[in-house]
């Protein structure tokens, strides 16, 4: 049996109205949180939320979490960085409990596309995924993590994308007594958009007494393929989720997303492995492919986005103006301009200009 599901995910809410000042952002963030909790029925379903400063999503300063619950759910914001929005983080266990309790309370099931549809019924904010973990479970299918890893490490099997290109993600594993129970395709990191973890789910649940321990005992074999998608890839999936109406469409999207990046082939015959073919057989139709980034991304546009959203320049200028007024701000900008005029570009900058100047001259300004 193969089962497809969303494991964990993170949403970010962005206000549709910019606050007048940084001082008004906290009040606005709480308004967004209140609207989310109302539309999601989160406190009715998961339990009372209380102020929390522990275990907030990384980078956020203030937030709420479920009181006295074994699962991790958090709503958070940063008082000084409006562009970070309001972060909604469901752990896998919290999402499982939310779905269970929601169905008991409202006598109808709920999936991620329905949750997003419910919380988007507002003019206060927009929502978008910043992370989503997609899991495909092989239950009693008699496949071995150790065997797959050994075949990959010996180059007897390779990984390709749906377009037929080799997936060159690095391979690593957790091995004990010559037995591999978990391996990764890709590396963990802040700017990594995709990572695949393949692991023995039964072993994980029974050894840690996890939330699905009793279920794991019922199976003789349980292997999970779990893909983590972040950043632009998560945004692509988020956009697709908003057009979904049926559970079968959700299944097609989740399987399409995972197999768009990860398909396993026998090297010599160039044919799909049996387990990868089983995954593709879940599809009624291929519904989704990750959009290819423009070749000019990671160039001027990314630098510009970093300056606008991540560099701290605007908070710095705001503080200058708040302390010394418009006169101080003008003097600060003049100081920065003088420093820029004294700047000497290094070799990397000159090589970049040699490579891309003609393209940008023809294309026009990125700051329109």
Tell what function each PLM region has.
Residues 1-297, 306, 310-368:
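Structured, helix-rich domain cores that form ligand/interaction pockets
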Residues 300-302:
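Helix-turn-helix DNA-binding segment
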């Amino acid at each position: 049996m193969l089962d497809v599901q969303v494991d964990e995910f993170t949403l970010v809410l962005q206000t549709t109205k910019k606050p007048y000042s940084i001082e008004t952002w906290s009040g606005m963030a709480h308004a967004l949180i209140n609207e989310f909790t109302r539309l999601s029925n989160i406190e009715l379903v998961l339990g009372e939320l209380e102020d929390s400063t522990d275990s907030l999503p990384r980078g956020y300063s203030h937030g709420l979490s479920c009181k006295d619950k074994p699962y991790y759910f958090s709503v958070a914001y940063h008082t000084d960085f409006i562009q970070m929005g309001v972060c909604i983080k469901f752990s896998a266990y919290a999402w499982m409990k939310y779905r269970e309790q929601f169905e008991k309370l409202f006598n109808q099931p709920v999936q991620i596309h329905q949750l997003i549809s419910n919380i988007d019924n507002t003019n206060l904010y927009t929502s978008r995924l910043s992370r989503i973990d997609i899991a495909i479970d092989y239950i009693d299918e008699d496949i071995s993590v150790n065997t797959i890893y050994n075949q990959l490490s010996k180059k007897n099997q390779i990984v390709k994308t749906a377009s037929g290109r080799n997936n060159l993600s690095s391979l690593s594993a957790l091995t004990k007594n010559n037995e591999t129970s978990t391996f990764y395709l890709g590396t963990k990191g802040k700017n990594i958009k995709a990572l695949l973890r393949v692991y023995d789910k039964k072993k994980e649940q029974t050894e840690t007494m996890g939330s699905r321990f009793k279920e794991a005992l019922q199976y003789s074999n349980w292997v999970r393929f779990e893909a983590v998608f972040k950043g632009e890839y998560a945004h692509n999936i988020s956009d697709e989720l908003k057009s979904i109406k049926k559970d079968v469409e959700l299944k097609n999207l989740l399987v399409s997303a995972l197999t768009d990046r990860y398909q396993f082939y026998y090297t010599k015959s160039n044919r799909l492995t049996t387990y990868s073919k089983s995954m593709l057989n879940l599809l009624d139709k291929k519904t989704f492919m990750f959009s290819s980034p423009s070749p000019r991304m990671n160039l001027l546009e990314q630098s510009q986005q970093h300056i606008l959203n991540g560099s701290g320049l605007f908070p710095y200028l705001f503080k200058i103006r708040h302390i010394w007024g418009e006169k101080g701000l003008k003097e600060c900008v003049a100081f920065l301009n003088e420093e820029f005029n004294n700047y000497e570009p290094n070799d990397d900058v000159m090589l970049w200009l040699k490579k891309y100047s003609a393209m940008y001259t023809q294309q026009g300004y990125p700051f329109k």
